[in-house]
Amino acid sequence: PSPNPSGPEGSSGRLVLMCSSQPGLWGRKRVHEEEQVQETGFRATALRYRPQTFAGLIGQEHVSQTLTNAIKSGRVAHSYLFSGPRGVGKTSAARILAKSLNCEHGPTDTPCGVCTNCIEIAESRSLDVFEIDGASNRGIEQIRDLRESVRFTPARSRYKIYIIDEVHMLTNEAFNALLKTLEEPPPYIVFVFATTEAAKVKITIRSRCQHYRFKRIQTREIQAR
């Protein structure tokens, strides 16, 4: 899609779906992780080695290379489906894609990690990147809120990016409502759907996404890291 570099700040409908007082699953997990680090001074291995660029995404070179080529050629899709087992980098890849598209020095396949947009995305506080837990926000009302939010242009980034984890948990009614947005998305919108059970995602949704299958990471690849 063509980027939309600016939009009205503080539009009343922008944060209907994900207000700060009710973060999605990933938001709550991120807050808990950072609190644990502050209290104990210990950072789990998974957190210390969470990839921040496509080059750091171990075991998924086929995904990294294809997404890198798409960004370099300016052929970014409106919707992606990342499927595979838990803990193989689906959400990390979605965040890296978000940083790549909205980095102040991009779009780039190597986000700088230090600009305001990159930092806010990494800390899950970007106004233009929404991380949504499909298991907790699975009903048609939540998707209607999302569709309302989509109408507003980005606050200060090129793209508004919606990362929906466990998307297969959405109800049929929610899928049908989401389909209407996928059929004619605004040029500044990118969806990234993550799932451990791609077969449960409705074919009408899958057919409108670029599907990336994440492999189980081998022990030797983890040890090498």
Each model region followed by its residue ranges:
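P-loop/Walker A NTP-binding region and its immediately flanking N-terminal helices
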Residues: 11-211, 215-223
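Extreme N-terminal basic, low-complexity initiation segments
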Residues: 2-11
